[in-house]
């Protein structure tokens, strides 16, 4: 089994790359907003109930997938590398898969802010992430998260791990998925 964690800044293309990777592998996509959009109509994103439900739902999903006969899972996440709670969450989910003897692959995407602002309003993104339909709020959130957090690693930070960092500013999602598939033999 393979567990592919695709991470990077807001609107870098994680879900779209995950969709393309799902098409060319036997892996299933579980993108970040699959849980967010289900719970958001009931609880504000900043509320303790929202955070608890999203986290618990994801953990249960990962536990079930890890003990299943699925080939693996692709998970997308805006990992705030300077956030201890985000790092703890990633460690928790990675441990679930490592205990199941899965191969964990880290795929880090980076792209220019200008390109990400364009992607932030792409039809594919808006189709699967209705909470992003308020363009002004979504753009403000993108820029604010960029300002407040570290969203891409420094060179060498992921030594000793299956890690691939791709600048996809000028690469389409299909090509990025091919690179990932080749690099990790998926």
Predicted regions and their residues:
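Hydrophobic anchor at the beta1->P-loop junction of P-loop NTPases
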Residues: 6
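P-loop (Walker A) phosphate-binding loop of NTP-binding proteins
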Residues: 9
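Conserved lysine of the Walker
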Residues: 14
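Conserved substrate/cofactor phosphate-moiety recognition/catalytic segment
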Residues: 19-63
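Short, amphipathic alpha-helical "lid/cap" segments that border enzyme active or binding sites
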Residues: 58, 62, 173-181
